[in-house]
Amino acid sequence: TIAESVDAKLGQLADCENLIPLYTKNFEANKNNEEWLRRAAGKMSDKDCTKDPLFVKIVTSLHNVKPSANSAYYLGVMNDKAGNSAKAIQYYNESVNLETDNFKKSKLLIRIASKHSKAQAVAYAQKALSYNPSNSDAYRIMAHAYASSANECGSTPFEKRAVYWLAAKTARKGGLESLAARYDALAPSKVDVFESGLAGKNITFKCWIGQSITVQRL
């Protein structure tokens, strides 16, 4: 094919300096040609020409012609790097929907979760766990979301600090012992529990968390 003879002719000269003008010239005529777009994207990726705006155009066209989990993910990463967070999340979500491998779905959902905070971060992390129940990153994100909301989730200083018990419990579910210990250290002490008179009682967090924790018995 013409594409193969061009590749052969370029040979070792197929670097960004040569590829970009060549693909720029041929892009318009091939913007709906899946084979050409795939080859061009692959070659530009191999030669590390991915920072050029042409690469984004080629991958976007390829995604429009033949959407795949990989092209959607790639566009998500590129929009991320460009600071277009909302667009990146849109492509990551599309990638999740197109992906058939549950472990990859879970990893993608973690990437989306890390772009959010609080309730949205937890929702995406929980979705990630539904595809891979042993994804410790999901528990890390959830624990962090709870801990970062301590100040807004209790009506007393004791209740606010009790949120750290929930964060620690969540971290432990993911086998994150050192993180759990850090949150435990921020939670009420045994003296605090004794003085509160709440030992063995339930505390419900009436903020976005909407969960309860049982205060440890002394």
Question: Which residues does each PLM region occupy?
Answer:
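Alpha-solenoid helical repeat scaffolds
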Residues: 24, 56-60, 93, 126, ...
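TPR/TPR-like (Sel1-like) alpha-helical repeat modules
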Residues: 1, 126-134, 147, 159-188
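Structural marker of alpha-solenoid helical repeat scaffolds
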Residues: 64-65, 98, 131
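Preference for long, solvent-exposed alpha-helical segments and helix-linker "stalks"
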Residues: 1-54, 65, 177-218
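Short coil/turn linking the two alpha-helices of tandem helical-hairpin repeats
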Residues: 45-49, 81-83, 103, 113-120, ...
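Structural register within alpha-helical repeat arrays
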Residues: 39-44, 75, 108-112, 142, ...
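Residue-level recognition of tetratricopeptide repeat
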Residues: 33, 68, 102-105, 134-136, ...
